[in-house]
Amino acid sequence: MLRVGNLTVDVQGSRVLRGISFEVKAGELVYLVGRNGAGKTTSLRTIMGFRKPAAGSIITFESVNLIGLRPYRIARLGIGFAPEESEVFGELTVAENIALPTWTHPQTREAEARIERVYRVFPQLERYRARGGHALSGGERKMVSIARALALGPKLLLLDEPTEGLSPVIVPAIIQGLANIRTFGHAVFIAESNIHHVPDFADRLYVIERGEIVFAGAPELAARDPAVARIVGGTAPGGSGAAIEAPPAV
């Protein structure tokens, strides 16, 4: 699905990513965790073609190398992206915001079915279809942003800090949505700064520090890794601090 190998990225003369490697297999939910400035967002933006790497490879979908492709071509290959600061248009309704990427595509029954499926990812949005974007809370805006990234039915979804700045009350709803996304067969790769927001049902966890991968493995193994504890603090997933369990699928 996605194999990143020896990825090296320089930004304004500084080395931000130092030969990192990771993979996301079909249908997996994989996390990249690290402190602010560790290189998480740069990793996602490089995959999407917004940054050009100094070295390395990004291989996906039948051995296609994404390096050198423009963002719109990468999106057409079946990769969706919801950045941390995703814009929700206040003058559009929730339904219009979500369907926005489809406006330049044929309106087929299959396309309509994909949109309807989005509302099963976040059922909370169903009753807000006609609400204007300007009237949404921060958590609702985040749901709309993720839902919009799903509108074209990507095979792989990249999410940058989907729980950043959200109330602890709304975080479980976002986590539930991630579980729902996976039931529809999408692979998901998430950059996250708070390791306590990594659910127990995640398939794999990478920890990045100063542009280098310092841990790769099952989330429950991170609890026993001293390097992870030093970087992220507290109890890692699988330990006594892991309060988010696998929710029921829809």
Label each region the model flagged.
Residues 132-136, 140:
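Conserved ABC ATPase signature
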Residues 48:
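Helix-to-loop junction immediately C-terminal to a conserved catalytic motif
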Residues 56-65, 77, 110-115:
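Conserved ABC transporter NBD signature motif
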Residues 157-161:
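Catalytic Walker B motif of ABC-type/P-loop ATPase nucleotide-binding domains
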